[in-house]
Amino acid sequence: MAKAYDHLFKLLLIGDSGVGKTCLIIRFAEDNFNNTYISTIGIDFKIRTVEIEGKRIKLQVWDTAGQERFKTITTAYYRGAMGIILVYDITDEKSFENIQNWMKSIKENASAGVERLLLGNKCDMEAKRKVLKEQADKLAREHGIRFFETSAKSSMNVDEAFNSLARDILLKSGGRRSGNHSKPSSTDLKPSDKKNTNKCSLG
């Protein structure tokens, strides 16, 4: 029996508590949004399979499950990760400033050359914005990584961000190269048109 996928990529989301990591994972994996915050014990992950460059990619997306509050994210969490998404909240300047600390954590714990992506979440809360898009764009350029602003609430750019990272990993690992991979990947999965009224203030 043929495998249901061609590649398995382990992705991590890291960032300060409350920036919306869990909400982003649930939006990506289940196309759902819930503003009720339930802190999980230990490590949790969700799975979604996408098609990129004609390959079926199984994405195993890991959540820190609140560990960052206790500074207990260990090397074991980073082990085997092929891509890491650094998340901050555009309405929380401190969460953006701490991205540099998370970059340091990656350098100390993750495999050399792991693909990274910077993600500014809660862009549906423009009126409360504290971090300018230009600031994050500059930081991403300094580190040579991609940058997206997303909203787990509205689903804006969520698929695009995850698929872009998956495509970069695929190309790096010797997958089929497209004519232009500078754009975020397109997949067979369409963004949600659902409107939600809740805010993802935690996660």
From Swiss-Prot:
Motif (Switch 2): 63-80
Chief subcellular location: membrane
SMART domains recorded: ARF, RAB, RAN, RAS, RHO
Keyword terms of this UniProt record: Cell junction, Cell membrane, Cell projection, Cytoplasmic vesicle, Endosome, Golgi apparatus, GTP-binding, Hydrolase, Isopeptide bond, Lipoprotein, Magnesium, Membrane, Metal-binding, Methylation, Nucleotide-binding, Phosphoprotein, Prenylation, Protein transport, Tight junction, Transport, Ubl conjugation
Cross-link Glycyl lysine isopeptide (Lys-Gly) (interchain with G-Cter in ubiquitin), where in sequence: K46, K58
EC category: hydrolase
Lipidation (S-geranylgeranyl cysteine): C200
Residues the entry annotates as binding Mg(2+): T22, T40, D63
Keyword Protein transport applies: yes
Record's subcellular location: Cell membrane; Cytoplasmic vesicle membrane; Cell junction, Tight junction; Golgi apparatus, trans-Golgi network membrane
Catalytic activity: GTP + H2O = GDP + phosphate + H(+)
Membrane topology: Lipid-anchor
Cleaved propeptide residues: 201-203
InterPro entries assigned to the protein according to its UniProt record, in alphabetical order: P-loop_NTPase, Small_GTP-bd, Small_GTPase, Small_GTPase_Rab
SUPFAM superfamilies per record: P-loop containing nucleoside triphosphate hydrolases
Binding-site positions, GTP: S17, G18, G20, K21, T22, C23, T40, G66, N121, K122, D124, A152, K153
Modified residues (Cysteine methyl ester): C200
EC number: 3.6.5.2
Domain topic, free-text comment: Switch 1, switch 2 and the interswitch regions are characteristic of Rab GTPases and mediate the interactions with Rab downstream effectors. The switch regions undergo conformational changes upon nucleotide binding which drive interaction with specific sets of effector proteins, with most effectors only binding to GTP-bound Rab.
Complexes and interactors: Interacts (GTP-bound form) with MICALL2; competes with RAB8A and is involved in tight junctions assembly. Interacts (GTP-bound form) with MICALL1. Interacts (GTP-bound form) with MICAL1, MICAL3, MICALCL, EHBP1 and EHBP1L1; ternary complexes of RAB8A, RAB13 and either MICAL1 or EHBP1L1 are possible. Interacts with PRKACA; downstream effector of RAB13 involved in tight junction assembly. Interacts with GRB2; may recruit RAB13 to the leading edge of migrating endothelial cells where it can activate RHOA. Interacts (isoprenylated form) with PDE6D; dissociates RAB13 from membranes.
Membership in a protein family: Belongs to the small GTPase superfamily. Rab family.
Name of the protein: Ras-related protein Rab-13
Lineage, opening ranks: Eukaryota, Metazoa, Chordata, Craniata, Vertebrata
